[in-house]
């Protein structure tokens, strides 16, 4: 997904990374019908078939996606999306299934009307093809307008609850009070809070301006002072939040799996958490000016 992350991952490295995940203590993997135009699910499915199936107790989460050419996202497309995903993954059902990115559909009414894609999502759950269903997207205002009108088990939001952007705070509070499981994605702001501002000067899948990188550089200085990897700070900012059920962080190398586990369990001093509260964070939409390119 070079347009999203700025680089590609070859087949061999992807397989090695997946096997490291399946062999370790991690028990949750998130993907989507349209990630890499289906290549993500295909790679996961190939790895699972080679292993003889999904490890016991492992949770696969995927997402229903619109037709990527027409933008159509009616009930028929939702069902087709599921069928494509099950075939690629080589499974009969998934543990978690989200409706994905309605903000990019050609007609929102196809999704929300009676008999639309959302009704199809809950029908899929009733049929036992998904254990839990959710809404996965970015735009908070649209997410909130949909979220309370259906009995979602979960939500997934990205890039809007991390050390440098806290715009999802209000929505997460309301969702938690209603008992909706919160899956917080992109704790590294799409990479800069893991690899650093010099290596990965991108925020929310876009090249970041000098001004946008200022809080990142300030955090890097604080982390260096305390001898703490900025990735550990970014990851634990999410994992220590009692409202958040699970944090979805991307890994593209086998060694990143163990690094993520190390970051998640690293002991961070109280002084660090106190100091970062003095850093300016954004409450604005991090994708307001993004030129979206699917895949």
Model-identified regions with their sequence ranges:
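Acidic (Asp/Glu)-rich catalytic clusters
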Residues: 23, 45-56, 86-91, 146-150, ...
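Active-site groove signature of glycoside hydrolases
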Residues: 86-107
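Beta/alpha (TIM)-barrel catalytic core signal, keyed to glycine-rich beta->alpha loops juxtaposed to Asp/Glu
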Residues: 102-283, 287, 291-295
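Structural motif corresponding to the early beta-alpha repeats
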Residues: 51, 55-74, 100
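N-terminal binding-site loop/beta-alpha segment at the start of enzyme catalytic domains
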Residues: 1-58
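Short, acidic/polar
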Residues: 8-21, 74-88, 138-145
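Acidic-and-aromatic substrate-binding clefts and catalytic sites of carbohydrate-active enzymes
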Residues: 7, 32-41, 67-72, 105, ...
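Active-site mouth loops of central-metabolism enzymes
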Residues: 1-12, 64-77, 109
């Amino acid at each position: 997904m070079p347009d999203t992350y700025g680089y590609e991952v070859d087949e061999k490295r992807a397989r090695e990374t997946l096997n490291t995940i399946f062999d370790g203590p991690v028990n949750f993997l998130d993907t989507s019908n349209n990630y890499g135009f289906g290549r993500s699910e295909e790679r996961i499915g190939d790895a699972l078939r080679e292993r003889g199936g999904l490890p016991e107790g492992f949770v696969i989460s995927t997402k229903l996606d619109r037709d990527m050419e027409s933008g159509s996202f009616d009930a028929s497309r939702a069902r087709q999306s599921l069928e494509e995903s099950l075939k690629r993954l080589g499974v009969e059902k998934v543990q978690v299934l989200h409706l994905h990115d309605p903000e990019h559909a050609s007609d929102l009414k196809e999704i929300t009307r009676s008999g639309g894609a959302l009704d199809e999502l809950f029908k899929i759950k009733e049929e036992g093809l998904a254990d839990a269903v959710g809404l996965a997207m970015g735009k908070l205002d649209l997410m909130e307008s949909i979220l309370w009108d259906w009995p979602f088990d979960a939500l997934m939001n990205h890039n809007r609850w991390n050390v440098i952007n806290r715009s999802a705070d209000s929505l997460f509070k309301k969702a938690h009070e209603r008992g909706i499981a919160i899956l917080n994605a992109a704790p590294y702001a799409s990479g800069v809070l893991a690899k650093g501002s010099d290596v990965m000067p991108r925020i929310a899948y876009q090249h970041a301006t000098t001004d946008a990188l200022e809080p990142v550089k300030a955090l890097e200085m604080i982390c260096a002072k305390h001898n703490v990897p900025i990735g550990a700070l970014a990851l634990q900012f999410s994992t220590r939040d009692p409202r958040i059920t699970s944090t979805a962080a991307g890994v593209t190398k086998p060694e990143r799996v163990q690094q993520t586990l190390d970051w998640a369990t690293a002991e961070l001093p109280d002084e660090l958490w106190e100091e970062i509260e003095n850093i300016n964070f954004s409450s604005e939409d991090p994708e307001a000016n993004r030129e979206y390119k699917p895949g």
